[in-house]
Amino acid sequence: VIEAFQSAGDVLRLRDVVIRTGYSKGMCFRLLYTLHQCGFLDKVGENHYRLASEVRRRRLYRIGYAAQGQDSSFDREVGLSLARAAEREHIELIVVDNRYQPKIALRSADYLVREQVDLVIEFQTDELIAPAIASKYLEANIPFIAIDIPHPGATYFGANNYQAGLMAGHYMGRWAKKHWNGEVEEILLIELLRAGSLPKARMRGLAAGISEVIRLPAACRTVSIDGDGQFQTSLERVRKYLRESKSKRILVGAANDPSALGALRAFEEAGRAPECVIVGQNAEPEARAELRVANTRLIASVAYFPEKYGDGLLRLALDILARKAAPPAVFTTHQVITPENVDHFYPNDSLLAAPG
């Protein structure tokens, strides 16, 4: 019955407790009366109850969070938003850092199993080890949520990858139609191959979105390279690509913003920035700063709003722990962020760079 109060501020009626617990009305009435008499519940009004203050201060659940890493602002935003939501819900959050490394991710899973957490939120990039990680939680009978990369047996939370790619492709196609009369010579896709099928769907969506807006010339070719989601790797591989490509009108779609910014740097170093336009994914602070630069060749980035992940993840986690019916996948919302609307969606970015 106490677990029916899913957050510290929940005020429930008798029938709410009946619905959440599945117990009979008579049993719930007796239990509510007893819990109130014993000091576990406060009565609010005539027929409403909430957790007593000393119970509210207790951590209702212990949830493990295996963070992807701390190198990108996206990862940090997800972690911070989750920590804020956990604190508000009086949940103990056990945090480990996978540091983008498969071996560490496996050790992190072992640690969370030993900690006997109630649920795990898993954020790791490598699709190849997802089955091994999943088996650890499944054997321990620990429910888990997988962020952005599917894991067998997990509830998925994160990007609608094909849709995010499609939105980017539509925007890029409209830009090419307006500024280049649709005369595109090459499409460069900077992928994140080790993350598997879903980020690849992002790239498929982007290519499809471009084709839905403009009729690509027969001579236009599509080139794919693996940027591994990293600025430096993308910079080096786009440098190599530019040594081989002589195209003058290139649409560049990147799996994430570090890859997009690495590509932009490579084009700028080669003195070929006017020959490209670039669209990123995630709308991270570094990309938003670039969107504010006059005449930048980064024309857009699709936002995933990681600062809102924590609330959505905790709602989903509490539903799972309360044994409510949970969907197999929960998708985040997306928005194309451009130089024209970046200040509307992120009016407080200047505070990020403020001293102190």
Segments and roles (model prediction):
Residues 113, 172-177, 242, 313-325:
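Short, hydrophobic alpha-helical segments
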Residues 66-80, 95-105, 126, 158-168, ...:
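Hinge/beta->alpha junction and helix N-cap segments in small-molecule ligand-binding domains
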Residues 64-66, 116-124, 143-147, 186-189, ...:
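Periplasmic-binding protein-like
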Residues 1-56:
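N-terminal helix-turn-helix
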Residues 52-70, 114:
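N-terminal helix-turn-helix/winged-helix DNA-binding helices
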Residues 127-163, 186, 284-293, 346:
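Flexible loop/hinge segments that line or gate small-molecule binding clefts
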Residues 112, 119-138, 206, 224-290:
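Hydrophobic alpha-helical
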Residues 61, 198, 210, 305-356:
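Hinge/cleft segment of the Venus flytrap/periplasmic-binding protein
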